[in-house]
Design a protein with these regions (language model features):
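Paired intracellular helix-loop junctions of major facilitator superfamily
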Residues: 1-10, 225-236, 265
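Glycine-rich segments within core transmembrane alpha-helices of 12-TM secondary carriers
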Residues: 10-35, 57-58, 243-253
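Small-residue (Gly/Pro/Ala) motifs that create kinks and tight helix-helix packing interfaces
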Residues: 23-36, 61, 65, 134, ...
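A late C-terminal transmembrane helix in Major Facilitator Superfamily
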Residues: 24, 229-266, 274
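Symmetry-related core transmembrane helices of the 12-TM Major Facilitator Superfamily/SLC fold
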Residues: 48-67, 271-286
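Extracytoplasmic gate region of multi-pass secondary transporters
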Residues: 104-167, 219, 223, 253-254
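C-terminal transmembrane helical hairpin of 12-TM major facilitator-type secondary transporters
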Residues: 174-225
Length: 301
């Protein structure tokens, strides 16, 4: 995404991150089929085959990326010299409008830590829905493993559409603040409704779809905020810091929901905690961007 200027970044990031939603569309039924079809083959459990067969493509793609993905625009062999100059000039012009920060300033910048906190809150919701969506569908009355996988396609499919539509709306209007916070709020509302209507399949699926749409849409919208603040080596350090802090939620979220489920026999209380995290993330977005109508103005801070 470093080849795109800020005003065009939103749709690009959203299209890139729709891979998360599309992997849910494909991965749900595929995982269910693997677990059913391969259970007992070679003496392995279905989940063991699942890990093997779905892990191999990731390894192969990683190898391909190492050889194919270039470090910079200047090294891209599939661009002409004129295209390289145009892109480099556009990026240089765009970066000139952002504040310059040293690495030391990044780690001492309260706004960067605030962004990391926002990302942590949103990732709490992402991992919660990723790990527990099949279980929530099962709780709503679906017992067959393959049926559960097929039904999980619905929230992820709708989320992929929502991500693109919301990003286009944000780019057209230039408004980032309420788009980002609103996505977090919608995700939180969806999780609360999922807890309330967990026993009704139709209502539960509608609520889970709303939650998934809000959670996944919040992620590409969020990334326009820190990327508009920082540039150069400071951008790499700042984004790495935000990622590191935010992805701690990858451990906290599933563990927390699982612990609540073990203690209460239900995931409902865990859903409410995740909803609270999303609401907090949305509120922090509004606080972090007070007085700024879109992310381009954030650089003036």
């Amino acid at each position: 995404v470093s080849a795109y200027v800020v005003h065009a970044l939103m749709v690009v990031v959203a299209l890139f991150m729709t891979a998360i939603a599309l992997s849910g569309v494909v991965g749900g039924p595929l995982s269910s089929w693997i677990m059913q079809a391969f259970a007992g083959v070679n003496g392995w459990a279905g989940w063991q085959w699942l890990f093997l067969l779905e892990g191999i493509p990731s390894v192969l793609v990683g190898i391909a990326v190492y050889f194919y993905l270039d470090d910079s625009i200047a090294k891209a062999p599939w661009l002409t010299e004129a295209e390289k100059r145009l892109l480099i000039d556009n990026i240089s012009r765009d970066e000139g409008t952002r504040g310059d920060h040293s690495l030391k300033q990044v780690f001492r910048n309260g706004r960067v830590w605030l962004m990391a906190s926002i990302y942590f809150c949103f990732i709490m919701g992402l991992y919660g829905i990723s790990f527990w969506l099949p279980q929530l569908v099962k709780t709503a009355g679906v017992k067959d493993v393959l049926d559960v996988g097929l039904l999980t396609m619905i929230p992820y499919g709708l989320a992929a559409v929502a991500m693109v539509l919301a990003s286009r709306s944000s780019d057209r209007s230039g408004e980032r603040r309420w788009h980002t916070a609103g996505a977090g709020f919608i995700g939180g509302i969806g999780l609360i409704l999922s807890g309330i209507f967990g026993g009704d399949l139709a209502l539960a699926m509608a609520a889970l779809s709303l939650a998934t749409m809000g959670i996944l849409t919040s992620l590409p919208l969020f990334w326009t905020l820190p990327t508009s603040m920082l540039r150069g080596s400071a951008a790499a350090a700042g984004i790495a810091l935000i990622n590191a802090v935010g992805n701690l939620a990858g451990f906290v979220s599933p563990f927390m929901v699982g612990s609540v489920k073990d203690a209460t026999g239900s995931t409902t209380a865990g859903l409410y905690v995740l909803a609270g995290s999303l609401f907090l993330g949305g509120i922090l977005v509004l606080l972090a961007t007070r007085g700024r109508q879109h992310s381009a103005q954030l650089a003036a801070a």
